[in-house]
Amino acid sequence: MKILTVSDEVVERLYSLCQSGHFREIELILGCGDLPYPYLENLLTFLNVPLFYVPGNHDPTHNSDNPLAHVEGGSNLDLKVLRFKTFLIGGFGGCIRYRPDGTNQYSQSEAYLRAFRLLPRLLLNKINYGRALDILITHSPPFGIHDEDTHAHQGLKAINWLLHVAKPRYHFHGHTHFQRRNLSPSETTQGLTKIANVFPYKIIEVNH
């Protein structure tokens, strides 16, 4: 299955690529946060495939009754797990708290408490499907992987815990902006998991 993953920066060129049929094989869009919701809605309209997303630290608090606080037609996957085709996909939004009143920002302890809320569904998946998760999407990177020295871009240790417990085959995130000048790779393999920073977008083919 081919997935369009996006995060953190609007790439208007994607609109013309969508219209030209360049993405005709895309079956799913995954948003990893900090993108204007109209941008995600436009991609959804052009490709006419499901869209799952998690909020970033620059996104509003989710409110399904407020058209400005959710993606119309998309599914907010924060702290949720669902099955799409044959893939089990989970989401974890937000990043490390770097402002006292920051939206979708959490201390390391708060992030752990949020992550624990996914545990019952992960265990149920393990019983029903023999595996907890195939794909994990987050805004923040894990602690020590694709993160940065600045506090605002420090990874969340709770995501490391989720990777250890759920052992997904794929983990996609944003938040840290890998530019061409960066020497660090944007893809890493840890254990059974391929970890990819999808900024600003990547087309990824996933398999079981």
Role assignments for model-derived ranges:
Residues 5-7, 28-34, 51-57, 77, ...:
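Active-site neighborhood of phospho(di)ester-bond hydrolases with catalytic His/Asp-centered motifs
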Residues 1-46, 124, 128-132:
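N-terminal active-site segment of His-dependent metallophosphoesterases
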Residues 81-85, 160-166, 178-208:
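Binuclear metal-dependent phosphoesterase catalytic core
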Residues 5-13, 59, 65-154:
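Conserved catalytic scaffold of divalent metal-dependent phosphoesterases
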Residues 14-20, 38-41, 63, 76-77, ...:
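A generic local structural motif
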Residues 10-14, 35-41, 57-64, 97-102, ...:
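Active-site environment of divalent metal-dependent phosphoester hydrolases
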Residues 23-24, 44-48, 71, 162-167, ...:
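Short, conserved loop/helix-junction motifs that constitute active-site signature segments
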